Amino acid sequence: MSTDIKFAITGVPTPPSSNGAVPLRRELRDLQQNYPEQFNLYLLGLRDFQGLDEAKLDSYYQVAGIHGMPFKPWAGVPSDTDWSQPGSSGFGGYCTHSSILFITWHRPYLALYEQALYASVQAVAQKFPVEGGLRAKYVAAAKDFRAPYFDWASQPPKGTLAFPESLSSRTIQVVDVDGKTKSINNPLHRFTFHPVNPSPGDFSAAWSRYPSTVRYPNRLTGASRDERIAPILANELASLRNNVSLLLLSYKDFDAFSYNRWDPNTNPGDFGSLEDVHNEIHDRTGGNGHMSSLEVSAFDPLFWLHHVNVDRLWSIWQDLNPNSFMTPRPAPYSTFVAQEGESQSKSTPLEPFWDKSAANFWTSEQVKDSITFGYAYPETQKWKYSSVKEYQAAIRKSVTALYGSNVFANFVENVADRTPALKKPQATGEESKSTVSAAAAHAVELSGAKKVAEKVHNVFQHAEEKAQKPVVPVKDTKAESSTAAGMMIGLSIKRPSKLTASPGPIPESLKYLAPDGKYTDWIVNVRAQKHGLGQSFRVIVFLGEFNPDPETWDDEFNCVGRVSVLGRSAETQCGKCRKDNANGLIVSGTVPLTSALLQDIVGGELQSLKPEDVIPHLRANLKWKVALFNGDEYNLEEVPDLKVSVASTEVTIDEEGLPHYSRQYTVYPEITEGKPCGHGPEDHI
């Protein structure tokens, strides 16, 4: 294959250290609070990077365009195909979604982005005045700069939003290169095209209308509505944290962990994947904007923070499972550089990314360790430990600190945050009666969610009672549905001592639900044709009643979680997507249920996590809906190959509170049979 330019992807040049240490990619909020000079350089460097001539090979525009539109070869890989004509060949695009190469392909892609951003940061640092030591300070800070990540699954710092203000604010304060503090257009909020179509037809008519990237754009004006994101992330945070914890601590096979393609042999415990969770964040943060469409998502600055976090989660998982890597599989579709049916393996070239020699393309085997590109993460500083065992124990400790050790500990931490943007008031310390904070009360009034508040008071009051005596079954009194007006989560309000985490692995008031440290864990599995609707859509899962207006679904109290399907139209220029569509590619995802069931238990609506109690409860209360890219409801039974099922497995919690999953799953068609697209006894999982 001929190429015009062999652009070597090196990542950031990193001098070797005596102990193998490399600089860290840091969480965005950590970078902003604890490394202010690097954060300032990040903003200024990104601003300049985004301002580069769009014709420049390593410009922001060109690098983002590798991921989808404008569907042109990058660095001449290949150089002899006219991609302006969608029908000129069967190929299209480099990206490898729903394939075994999904997470490995994105690593050199991120290294290219980081390489270009780093160069911009270094140039900015040199522009500061020498006087007062300002230049020296910023040059020193720039040396170890690495691209940050946004950890969307961890609890936000107290008193802050689930979606950081640094990402949602249209302007932001910086110390500019003249040494003066000023307000600039926030380069983390949007990328402004200059112009939107450097070459005629680079973007479709639908995307050409936007001069800048947008999130949840207003249907009439096209204005970005970033304020929608924080309450949506907050409302489904418990499900998201449980999903990440499940993936990192339960999944042991790389193929199952990494990507979302479904086949008839998929185990009920393997419907989830890192790609599935990745899709959810694209959907939750983009709505009907750029992030929710893979063809244009890389132009949104959030894309890079999101994907660095995906890369981080892979690094964590890979170091916990060093002996598990990809199994060779046939390519499910054709791309610019791969024929359908060709074997994809750890030796498959990750085109268009040339290695450091510029003689060969990177392969998955070569990029397995992030240190290859000169970076690590706070959790993967392996050089600090004397043995693999000690290192892995430290990783697990970090995972449990960020995402919870087990579902019971997670529940105590998440119970007051699962509802939209802290509509649930939290109880105060040692008082015998719960009180509502002014902020939470205001949010409740704004959302009209007084019954939600009453229910959460009951959650705290019931917990100790249920530890002492059996629950008397009561009529379902699910909280009335509501929408969120407030966004603040994690306020510094003490929970009652009865529901705080105890030194043991399971909180005292919940131990009766896991005799001998064992309990039944529940999940909802969803599968559907990826491109069956010709657009992105989401399957939203509820446990209880909800408002029939789809505009409210993201904020519903009884919304448990979602599976997001990032589909494309049959007319897309993306060759692989056309192939996927023609072949009826099916993808899958998982929504954890156990945390929501625990809330119903302490709320007096469910007796235990045992099948004899959960089956009728789910049969009566489990519901799901489909919403399209623009938020409109879509008829469930018209979604090709949509199937929803419920499964469970036994989990044992060890003395340190870590869950050990049996991986033997039972499927319950009696829960979903007869419901629209519900799994029945004769259906294939």
From Swiss-Prot:
Changing P15T: In strain: Sing, TL and TS. Its cofactor is Cu(2+). The modification N-acetylserine is found at S2. Its EC number is 1.14.18.1. Changing K450R: In strain: TS. Keywords: Acetylation, Copper, Melanin biosynthesis, Metal-binding, Monooxygenase, Oxidoreductase, Thioether bond. Coiled coil: none annotated. Residues 409-685 form a propeptide. There is a cross-link at C95-H97 (2'-(S-cysteinyl)-histidine (Cys-His)). Cu cation A binds at H67, H97, H106. Cu cation B binds at H278, H282, H307. SUPFAM superfamilies: Di-copper centre-containing domain. One of its GO terms (biological process) is melanin biosynthetic process. GO terms for molecular function: metal ion binding; tyrosinase activity. It comes from the Eukaryota. This is a copper-containing oxidase that functions in the formation of pigments such as melanins and other polyphenolic compounds. Belongs to the tyrosinase family. This is Tyrosinase.
